[in-house]
């Protein structure tokens, strides 16, 4: 497997830290050791996150093509579009963001705080669109690219979550390689890796990266889309493509893609009582913030699996913290009492 063949434009601080979640582990019985790898702290570009790691492999193509405008898409509180806006500002590029109404949630300031607020501050052309949630290619995004062309610009398309981009899975192959290097220093290997999945390329990259040492099916995806079958299919497709790109040397099978569908509800972007409990528990025991859309749901899944005894006693479980905390402001009503 060869990731070094692909050019990478550094946007992150370097390897993200891994630290124990000792108080959380103890509160859940102490039979499973929980750790977190902090990709939520990976960059100085508007707080970074998992999309920043992915975009390190996309930006060389942007620059090679001579594009002058990054065009991307997400929900109103998209972490991805905030990271695209930050990178555009950092590189001196223009940025057009299509922000669709993906979440069935009403808050007086939902479209004015958090991620979308930062994107506007960074100078992005933010375009609110009424269409609902879908992880596929969207007409509104294609229309935005055409508008840039008509204005004389040269757009570069970055799909939702960077997932449909041909290079979108590479960053999290690198994540797996990074974990292996850190494991050598820690003196042990993680038995399971827990990660949130919606558009799919984060888990897909991990599946390929950990397949190199036989742990593909130890990557436990927690679905947060509440539409798990399209998500599962997209993870598998991206993983197979990425495996070919890096020369994994074996096929990725359906058995390699583990997606737990118990925690995505009630809808995309809407937290359950269990999600809110997980957000508060990790915050109050570890000072580690998670969000209602993504990481709160994967944290809920990990906590529930420990409580149910689904990880064997003595397991070491790595929680991949992908970011998402800037969206908390948009859900302020849910946390008015803490």
UniProtKB/Swiss-Prot annotation:
N6-(pyridoxal phosphate)lysine modified-residue sites: 51
Keywords: Hydrolase, Pyridoxal phosphate
Keyword flag Hydrolase: yes
Pfam families, sorted: PALP
Top-level EC class as recorded in UniProt: hydrolase
Catalytic activity: 1-aminocyclopropane-1-carboxylate + H2O = 2-oxobutanoate + NH4(+)
Needed co-factor(s): pyridoxal 5'-phosphate
Matching SUPFAM superfamilies: Tryptophan synthase beta subunit-like PLP-dependent enzymes
BP terms from Gene Ontology: 1-aminocyclopropane-1-carboxylate metabolic process; amine catabolic process
Family: Belongs to the ACC deaminase/D-cysteine desulfhydrase family.
Subunit architecture: Homotrimer.
Its biological purpose: Catalyzes a cyclopropane ring-opening reaction, the irreversible conversion of 1-aminocyclopropane-1-carboxylate (ACC) to ammonia and alpha-ketobutyrate. Allows growth on ACC as a nitrogen source.
Stated name of the protein: 1-aminocyclopropane-1-carboxylate deaminase
Native organism: Cupriavidus necator (strain ATCC 17699 / DSM 428 / KCTC 22496 / NCIMB 10442 / H16 / Stanier 337) (Ralstonia eutropha)
């Amino acid at each position: 497997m060869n990731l070094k063949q692909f050019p990478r434009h550094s946007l992150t601080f370097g390897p993200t830290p891994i630290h124990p979640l000792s108080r959380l582990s103890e509160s859940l019985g102490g039979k499973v050791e929980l750790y977190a790898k902090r990709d939520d702290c990976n960059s100085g570009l508007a707080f970074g996150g998992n999309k920043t790691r992915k975009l390190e492999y996309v930006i060389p193509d942007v620059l090679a093509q001579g594009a002058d405008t990054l065009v991307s898409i997400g929900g109103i509180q998209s972490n991805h579009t905030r990271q695209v806006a930050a990178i555009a500002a950092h590189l001196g590029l223009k940025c057009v963001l299509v922000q669709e109404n993906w979440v069935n949630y009403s808050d007086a300031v939902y479209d004015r705080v958090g991620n979308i607020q930062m994107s506007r501050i960074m100078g992005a052309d933010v375009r609110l669109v009424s269409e609902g949630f879908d992880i596929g290619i969207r007409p509104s995004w294609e229309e935005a690219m055409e508008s840039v062309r008509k204005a004389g610009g040269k757009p570069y398309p970055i799909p939702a979550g960077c997932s449909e981009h041909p290079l979108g899975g590479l960053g999290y192959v690198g994540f797996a390689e990074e974990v292996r290097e850190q494991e050598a220093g820690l003196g042990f290997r993680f038995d399971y890796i827990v990660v949130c999945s919606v558009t799919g390329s984060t888990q897909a990259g991990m599946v390929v990266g950990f397949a190199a040492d036989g742990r593909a099916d130890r990557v436990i995806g927690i679905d947060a889309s509440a539409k798990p079958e399209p998500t599962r299919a997209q993870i598998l497709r991206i993983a197979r493509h990425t495996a070919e790109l890096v020369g994994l040397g074996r096929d990725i099978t359906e058995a390699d893609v583990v997606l737990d569908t118990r925690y995505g509800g009630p809808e995309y972007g809407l937290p359950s009582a269990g999600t809110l409990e997980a957000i508060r528990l990790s915050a109050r025991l570890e000072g580690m913030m998670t969000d209602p859309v993504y990481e709160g749901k994967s944290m809920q899944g990990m906590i529930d699996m420990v409580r149910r005894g689904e990880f064997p006693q003595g397991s070491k479980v790595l929680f991949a913290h992908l970011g998402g905390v800037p969206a908390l402001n948009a859900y302020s009503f849910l946390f008015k009492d803490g």
